[in-house]
Curated annotation (Swiss-Prot):
GO terms for biological process: translation. GO terms for molecular function: structural constituent of ribosome. The lineage of its organism: Bacteria, Pseudomonadati, Pseudomonadota, Alphaproteobacteria, Rhodobacterales. Disulfide bonds: none annotated. Gene3D superfamilies: 3.30.1320.10. Residues 88-116 are annotated as: Disordered. This is Small ribosomal subunit protein bS16. The keyword Ribosomal protein applies. Keywords: Ribonucleoprotein, Ribosomal protein. GO terms for cellular component: cytoplasm; small ribosomal subunit. Residues 99-110 have a biased composition (Basic and acidic residues). It comes from Cereibacter sphaeroides (strain ATCC 17023 / DSM 158 / JCM 6121 / CCUG 31486 / LMG 2827 / NBRC 12203 / NCIMB 8253 / ATH 2.4.1.). HAMAP family: Ribosomal_bS16. Belongs to the bacterial ribosomal protein bS16 family.
Length: 116
């Protein structure tokens, strides 16, 4: 059974409130879960203590059982000191696409032709 530690959305329209849960990865986002590990309220100020609440002992237990945190939960765990900071590197994001590369080449050719 592939386990995930992820966010389950609650609250009403335009007023989100999330539960941090341990669940089977095949279950729906807001569906059945095995254990509620904490809460996350994005509407509170970033420096508020009540913004993210987690039962760290149970989170460690589920990580030891092989549960994989989602990206957002992994960031919460990094902030809590339970997980090492992941290196986020995407070198291809800065490389222009084919069309932009062609346009840049044409522009450089025109500049070289006008300089001669």
């Amino acid at each position: 059974m592939a386990m995930k530690i992820r966010l389950a959305r609650g609250g009403s329209k335009k007023r989100p409130h999330y539960s941090i849960v341990a669940s089977d990865s095949r279950m729906p986002r807001d569906g059945r879960f095995l254990e509620k590990l904490g809460t996350y309220n994005p509407l509170l100020a970033k420096d508020s203590e009540d913004r993210i609440k987690m039962n760290l002992e149970r989170v460690q237990y589920w990580l030891a059982q092989g549960a994989q945190p989602t990206d957002r939960v992994a960031r919460f765990l990094e902030a809590a000191g339970l997980k090492e900071k992941a290196v986020r590197n995407n070198p291809k994001a800065a490389v222009p696409g084919k069309r932009m590369a062609e346009l840049a080449k044409k522009k450089a050719d025109r500049a070289a032709a006008s300089a001669e």
